[in-house]
């Protein structure tokens, strides 16, 4: 007999019991996609051992969803080979929005999707058992996949002695690490989304491939809900709204580096202004460090040896330089310009730094995935005893910031990775426990992500949920046990001795460009007044009303409002439509009556009409709406 732990309970099981055997004794086990054993995701066919700790996962769990989609990708490949036997499958990973599979020697269009989906449905209905095969040698694996040059290339690159596995379902077999569903049966609903060109391993010099994207779900209902969400997301696409609302553009000459227009800069300045006020009140001091620094700095930080392929480098007077991909090393140098005492701690240093990181062109996407962006970093230097309290302070700051934008969020605590190289076991345990206690005391829901911490310390990731329930990883709080030591940072402790400070590295927006993209989609371009690129548009009925309109606009601009005047020759109704299409918060129509009675005719972008309003009431209400950072209009 062996003993295993599941859901904090101990079970005695016969030797040789598999996770599937054990699962069969649990209610609703047919929903299980896989099992996490000792923090590693496994197939249900895995044999259990003495002392194993296990947790079964379903489609609603991130691990279970990945298994489900991975098997769905194999079903797609099997369907393609049934319909186009000469196609050559290459790789088919799970991605955020579903999965894709790349094929060589295949020519299809979206007109073929229905036929492919029907074949996928047939494969699912056949309920093939998904079986794992472990090859005895690299030679055996090469023989199995000898007709597929892409698989052969992957196998040859594997280190000698590494386990090589494949998964089969019916007549189809694919080189794969797994894990997978026990059978093709649970995959009930498919939808192929689009096809595109791709290159083997993302290299334009290599073979051209056809990439097919898809999604899959356990039920048709879930698929329909997802497709509705995709339709809504398309309406909110920040790339489309960004151009329509004249916020930003992208140019071929600078892929991944957006151009912000005047209207976009108004939103940008509002975001940054809010961030600065928030941090000043929280006791942060702001710095600015250079974008270009020499190789010697990046060697000390470890970036030159570990991150150089993602950095932009150049030579100046025969010396290597790099544009910074991260703000951290610059802050380390700032810290060293002064002597420090424990009495100054926590020392909170913030920077909105412009960083550059190389991304392949195929991965670029609007403001969400770029090569140049601004990151709102802060580095907090403190003693080990202050970690828990300061982490809690940061979590309170997180709550205040995201609630200001009406964004819900959840937190993930990532613990020590298996191959962590920095710090002792004891230090990792203390650091992780301090972060976990802070999370508990913040009363914010969180989950533990075992083994996903950085090599230099545990971290808390912040995942926000937008208006259509999509989640985005934005901010992070990381305990860094590496850089302070690497840069030989010191402070004088309470005993008068020199010590190395602990450092909390955190970003709240993360990439400000990405956060702005999220906000555009979250608000669907309909920004609250304090963030809006155009607060008020004054619309004249006739040319004779232009002087009064301009006088009002000038006065309101002095109060901090963004005001424009439309005195064009268009009809009043066309002017109103134009303003509403640009999501202007308030339109003020000015004609003879309004001038004679000294009143205003107000119209909101939701088409609410408020006639005969006094200027004082209008301005006082808008000032309250703007200054309170209200998410909803007060008129």
UniProtKB/Swiss-Prot annotation:
SUPFAM superfamilies: Class II aaRS ABD-related, Class II aaRS and biotin synthetases, MoaD/ThiS, ThrRS/AlaRS common domain. GO terms for cellular component: cytoplasm. Keywords: Aminoacyl-tRNA synthetase, ATP-binding, Cytoplasm, Ligase, Metal-binding, Nucleotide-binding, Protein biosynthesis, RNA-binding, tRNA-binding, Zinc. Its EC number is 6.1.1.3. It is found in: Cytoplasm. Residues 237-528 are annotated as: Catalytic. InterPro entries: aa-tRNA-synt_IIb, aa-tRNA-synth_II, aa-tRNA-synth_II/BPL/LPL, Anticodon-bd, Anticodon-bd_dom_sf, Beta-grasp_dom_sf, Mopterin_synth/thiamin_S_b, TGS. It comes from the Bacteria. GO terms for molecular function: ATP binding; metal ion binding; threonine-tRNA ligase activity; tRNA binding. GO terms for biological process: threonyl-tRNA aminoacylation. Zn(2+) binds at residues 328, 379, 505. SMART domains: tRNA_SAD (SM00863). Catalyzes the attachment of threonine to tRNA(Thr) in a two-step reaction: L-threonine is first activated by ATP to form Thr-AMP and then transferred to the acceptor end of tRNA(Thr). Also edits incorrectly charged L-seryl-tRNA(Thr). Belongs to the class-II aminoacyl-tRNA synthetase family. Homodimer. This is Threonine--tRNA ligase. It comes from Chlamydia abortus (strain DSM 27085 / S26/3).
């Amino acid at each position: 007999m062996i003993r295993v732990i599941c859901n904090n309970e101990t079970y005695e099981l016969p030797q040789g019991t598999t996770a599937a055997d054990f699962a069969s004794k649990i209610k609703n086990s047919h929903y299980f996609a896989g099992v996490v054993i000792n923090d590693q995701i496994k197939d249900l066919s895995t044999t259990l051992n003495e002392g194993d700790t296990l947790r079964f996962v379903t489609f609603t769990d991130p691990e279970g969803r990945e298994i489900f989609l991975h098997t769905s990708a194999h079903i797609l490949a099997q369907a393609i080979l049934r319909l186009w036997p000469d196609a050559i499958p290459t790789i088919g990973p799970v991605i955020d929005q579903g999965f894709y599979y790349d094929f060589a020697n295949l020519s299809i269009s979206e007109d073929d999707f229905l036929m492919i989906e029907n074949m996928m449905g047939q494969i699912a209905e056949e309920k093939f058992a998904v079986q794992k095969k472990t090859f005895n040698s690299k030679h055996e694996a090469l023989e199995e996949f000898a007709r597929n040059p892409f698989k052969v290339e992957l196998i040859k690159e594997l280190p000698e002695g590494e386990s090589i596995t494949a998964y089969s379902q019916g007549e189809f077999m694919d080189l794969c690490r797994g894990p997978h569903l026990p059978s093709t049966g649970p995959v009930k609903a498919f939808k192929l989304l689009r096809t595109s060109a791709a290159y083997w391993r993302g290299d334009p010099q290599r073979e051209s491939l056809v990439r097919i994207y898809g999604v899959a779900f356990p039920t048709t209902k879930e698929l329909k809900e997802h497709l509705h969400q995709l339709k809504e997301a398309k309406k909110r696409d920040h790339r489309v709204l960004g151009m329509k609302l004249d916020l930003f553009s992208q140019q071929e000459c600078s892929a991944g580096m957006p151009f912000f227009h005047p209207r976009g800069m108004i939103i940008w300045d509002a975001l940054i202004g809010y961030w600065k006020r928030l941090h000043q009140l929280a006791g942060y001091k702001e710095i600015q460090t250079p974008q270009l620094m020499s190789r010697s700095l990046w060697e000390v930080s470890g970036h030159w040896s570990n991150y150089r392929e993602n950095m932009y480098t150049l030579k100046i007077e025969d010396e290597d330089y790099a544009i910074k991909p991260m703000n951290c090393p610059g802050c380390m140098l700032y810290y060293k310009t002064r002597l420090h005492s424990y009495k100054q701690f926590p020392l909170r240093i913030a920077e909105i730094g412009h960083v550059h990181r190389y991304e392949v062109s195929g991965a670029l996407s609007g403001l969400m995935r770029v090569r140049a962006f601004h990151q709102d970093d802060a580095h907090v230097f403190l003693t080990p005893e202050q970690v828990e309290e300061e982490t809690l302070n940061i979590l309170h700051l997180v709550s205040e910031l995201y609630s200001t934008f009406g964004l819900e969020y959840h937190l993930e605590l990532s613990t020590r990775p298996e191959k962590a190289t920095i710090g002792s076991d004891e230090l990792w345990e203390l650091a992780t426990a301090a972060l976990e206690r802070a999370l508990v005391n913040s009363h914010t829901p969180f989950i533990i992500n075992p083994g996903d911490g950085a090599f230099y310390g545990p971290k808390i990731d912040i995942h926000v949920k937008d208006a259509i329930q999509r989640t985005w990883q934005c901010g992070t709080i990381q305990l860094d046990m590496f850089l302070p030591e690497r840069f030989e940072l010191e402070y004088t402790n309470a005993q008068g001795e020199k010590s190395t400070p602990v450092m909390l590295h955190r970003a709240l927006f993360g990439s400000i460009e990405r956060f702005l993209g999220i906000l555009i989609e979250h608000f669907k371009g309909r920004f609250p007044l304090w963030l809006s690129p155009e607060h008020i548009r004054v619309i004249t009925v006739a040319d004779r009303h232009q002087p009064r309109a301009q006088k009002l606009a000038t006065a309101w601009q002095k109060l901090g409002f963004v005001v424009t005047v439309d005195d064009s020759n268009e009809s009043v109704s066309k002017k109103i439509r134009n303003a509403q299409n640009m999501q202007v918060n308030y339109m003020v129509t000015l004609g003879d009556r309004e001038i004679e009675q000294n009143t205003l005719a107000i119209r909101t972008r939701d088409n609410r009409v408020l006639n005969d309003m006094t200027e004082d009431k209008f301005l006082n209400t808008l000032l309250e709406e703007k200054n309170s950072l209200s998410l909803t209009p007060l008129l």
